[in-house]
C-alpha cells in the first residue's frame, strides 16, 4: 500500500523500517549548513533495514559547471522569465525574475555543489557500501561528464 507523509527529511521517519529509501531529482543540498545535508543522508541510512538500499540522485557538478547557461530569457504567453545562474561559495545559484503584465516576482535557489567524493565519505561514515554508480536515468555508467550522479548504497 502506497502512502505519503510530510516530515523533515533531516530526521529519521521510521528507524530500520524500509527496504528502500530514495532521494531523487537533486532534493538534497539545499541546506546552508553542511550538518543538515549530512543529516538527510544519515536519516536515510537509519530508515532502511540492514542490507537494504538507499538511492541518491544528484546533478553531476562537473557537467553543471561546464554547461552552465549564465543567463536566459523565456516567454510563455504573456509571462516573461529572466533566469540568471552562477557559482558562488561552492553553490550554484539560480535567480528568476518573472514579469506577468504589471506584476513582478522574483526568487532564487541555491544548491551545494556536492561531488562524488563527498557522498563516498558520507557513505563510509554511515556504514553504507556504494554498490552502483550511474550517470543518467538510463543507468549508463557514471563518467566525469555524465548528466547525473546516481548512487546506489547498501546499509551494512
Q: Model features per residue range: what roles?
A:
Residues 16-19, 92, 144-149:
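A short, glycine/Asx- and small/polar-enriched loop/turn
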Residues 18-35:
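A short SAM/SAH-binding and catalytic strip from SAM-dependent methyltransferases
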Residues 1-14:
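Conserved SAM-binding strand-loop segment of SAM-dependent methyltransferases
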Residues 55-122:
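SAM-dependent methyltransferase
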Residues 36-53:
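A short glycine-rich, Lys/Arg-flanked "PGG" loop and its adjoining helix->strand segment in the class I
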Residues 116-156:
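C-terminal lobe and adjacent flexible extensions of AdoMet/dcAdoMet transferase-like proteins
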